[in-house]
Amino acid sequence: TTMTDILKPVFNSMRKGNVRYSKGGLNPTGASCVITDEMGNDKLIGKCHRAVWYSKTGVPRTNLPDDQTFIKFAVGHAMEDNFQTHWNRMGVLIEGNIPLREDISNGDPRGELIISGEVDGLLRDFEMNEEGEITRISSTKAIGMEMKTNRGFFAKKEVYGIGNKRYPTGHPKMDHVMQTALYLRMRWKLEEYYGVEIDSFRIVYCQVDDGLTTYFDISLSDGYSGEVIIKDRNGDRIQPDALASLEAGLDLKRIGGLTIENIMDRYYMMQDYLQDVENPPPRNYQLRYDEETFEKKLAAGEISKTGAANWEKKPLAQVGDWQCRYCDWKNHCLPYGVLTEKVEAGLLTEEAALGQLGIVGFGS
């Protein structure tokens, strides 16, 4: 007799997730924005419009996470619940997992713009002693909360600043910053309902493999609009380290253009793309960088030595944007991998592309 595999149904349940019903509208996780990076170049950050289009038009995902990834997700959820338990025990948690659905257009001539998401938590502001014992809880001020877990060497460097010359106190992930900025835009709903004033949100990070934690403070420059302001846990506005600029011989500036208005522009574009349910919008990222992008990224120090060597030596190496590499619709969008655009442009037949990729068709 075969032994009952008691784990298999767990993964099946994880894959299915909770019953998902669309609350309508676009989601904060789908945010994107064109910013000016530290070098002064325009740079797109956030979700690819085509990926959002696939999601909203119901195109089935072709590249689902594996079992290990589901375990990583589960660890993340467990950490969120754990932190909430402690904030609750200390008497400062107003509420956790608060659904928000709001028209954020605020009279924009382009019409309504419905965004729906879920805020991880809302805490009452408080005072405490050296030990962290709470001495006073505010009845009027509150802090919004986004919880994120991560793991691995790159997160340690980027988010926590370990061995990071450019940002020694770390830097939050831009996708998380934009998501949080949208909750700040919509926060009047929370303020009204809970009778509090919310000046900022915190993104709390927990590195599950090493137990590191940190947080960043996110606020808007002009009430519910304007520039998105990112501060580290010391309360200092984040900008590239002056010494790192000098050492690199670069004049590194604080990133610009990260505003509610610019984020909204991309959402309005997305809304227009969704009027056409037959034709997906253009790809925003590259599975393999073209020559021009490669040179730019190399100069900006955004490509590792290994990556650069692979790009130069291996014409099929997927040295490009992580947004394509880890996309849920990768095989649907790029059926011929890095050769897809050549096939689409008629420069390569499907058979030739498959041959180069080492996939031999039947009967040949």
Located regions from the model:
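Metal-dependent nuclease catalytic regions and adjoining charged, substrate-binding loops involved
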Residues: 157, 170-174, 189-364
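Extracellular structured ligand-interaction cores
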Residues: 116-118, 142, 177, 198-200, ...
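Short beta-strand-loop-alpha-helix junction that forms the active-site gateway
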Residues: 147-170
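Short, well-structured alpha-helical interface segments that form or flank functional binding sites
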Residues: 78, 82, 116, 175-182, ...
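Short, charged, amphipathic alpha-helix that recurs within catalytic cores of restriction-modification
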Residues: 162-189
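Metal-dependent nuclease catalytic cores that hydrolyze phosphodiester bonds in DNA/RNA
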Residues: 1-144, 151-157
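A residue-level signal for conserved active-site and pocket-lining positions in enzyme catalytic cores
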Residues: 48, 183, 327
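Secondary-structure boundary elements
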Residues: 124-129, 136-140, 185-201, 210
